Amino acid sequence: MKKSYITFEVALMKPYAVEDLPKNKIIEFFKLHWGSPEMVTSSGIYDCSALDGFAVINEEDKILGLITYLIIDNECEIISLDSMEEGKGIGTSLVQEVENLAIKKNCKIVKLITTNDNLLALKFYQKRGFILSQIILNAVEKARKVKPEIPLIGNDGIPIRDEIELIKVLN
């Protein structure tokens, strides 16, 4: 029964392109959930408010989920994914929207980077066909030199040290 509920929820969600939303709304979202729109990973430094992406919006015009991505050559990299209500299919619908676009753009893979403490993300992506492709040891220490507000301790009291790259090969 729960599975049909999730499927029903996903079917009702229509992700909007972030370019169709007010820029200040996107910036405020990233400030609230990440401290700033700036994302620093081993793959680069990004202004998430300037990236392409999709958002799920509720009836009150509140962002329930937002994903940003970057396409370079035949690779699509998910830079950020946030879902405000877990277990309702928001993250799944956003990832699927990016995968569909990546296929249309002839990308061979979708990839992303998360940190070693983000066990929920590791579970989420692996359940959706992503595989671990690389561990970048001490990458977060380097990122803190650019963005010192990155916390030392993350989810479940786990020290944030390493980045983990996940990939999904597209057919």
What is each model feature region?
Residues 80-82, 111-113, 165:
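Short aromatic/hydrophobic contact patches that present stacked aromatics
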Residues 17-86, 92-95, 169:
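Acetyl-CoA-dependent GNAT
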Residues 37, 41-44, 48, 60, ...:
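Conserved acyl-donor/pantetheine-binding loop and adjacent beta-alpha core of acyl/acetyltransferases
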Residues 112-121, 137-144:
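Conserved beta-strand-loop-alpha-helix junction that forms the acyl-donor binding cleft
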Residues 102-114:
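Conserved GNAT acetyl-CoA-binding A-motif
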Residues 88-102, 123-127:
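Conserved acetyl-CoA-binding loop-helix of GNAT-fold acetyltransferases
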Residues 1-21, 164, 168-171:
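Conserved N-terminal entry element of GNAT/NAT acetyltransferase domains
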